[in-house]
Amino acid sequence: MEIFGHVVSGLGEGKFFVGLTHYKNKFEELTGFTPFEGTLNVKLKHNFNLDEFNPIEFDGFEIDGKKYFGGKVLLIKLFNKQGNSINCAVVAPKKTDHSKKTLEIIAPIQLRKFLLLKNSDVVKLVI
């Protein structure tokens, strides 16, 4: 399945969360790659129901009394308008400030730099 969306600025929290050792190790286990510390945010025209695609679930954890929530991961391939692509994953935390129209994507590299992306660029996600 192909889905199109636009690159948008995030909330600035992806770098922190992906950088946490527990999340980083879990994402590596589930995706097969060590994620770059940050996410690419892609806004869709319609709500996205990750559960329709059999995502992989992961549990939350606790550090020094602070609870970090689990979520779901879905492996995808992301393409820029030039047709360059990379294997990556949509991450859907159980607790998020994003709408169901905004996807957070992790990859082994900085997607904006590797795929030469800027805000409003159209990207294609292949599931």
From Swiss-Prot:
GO molecular function, one term: nucleotide binding
EC class of the enzyme, as a word: transferase
Record: residues binding FMN: 96, 104
Functional pathway: Cofactor biosynthesis; FMN biosynthesis; FMN from riboflavin (CTP route): step 1/1
Residues engaged in binding Mg(2+): 39, 41
Keywords for the protein's UniProt record, in alphabetical order: Flavoprotein, FMN, Kinase, Magnesium, Metal-binding, Nucleotide-binding, Transferase
Catalysed reactions listed for this entry: riboflavin + CTP = CDP + FMN + H(+)
Gene3D superfamilies attached to this UniProt entry: Riboflavin kinase-like
Cofactor: Mg(2+)
Cofactor comment: Binds 1 Mg(2+) ion per subunit.
InterPro entries: Archaeal_Riboflavin_Kinase, RibK_CTP-dep, Riboflavin_kinase_archaeal, Riboflavin_kinase_CTP-dep, Riboflavin_kinase_dom_sf
Name of the protein: Riboflavin kinase
Organism the protein comes from: Methanococcus maripaludis (strain DSM 14266 / JCM 13030 / NBRC 101832 / S2 / LL)
Lineage: Archaea, Methanobacteriati, Methanobacteriota, Methanomada group, Methanococci
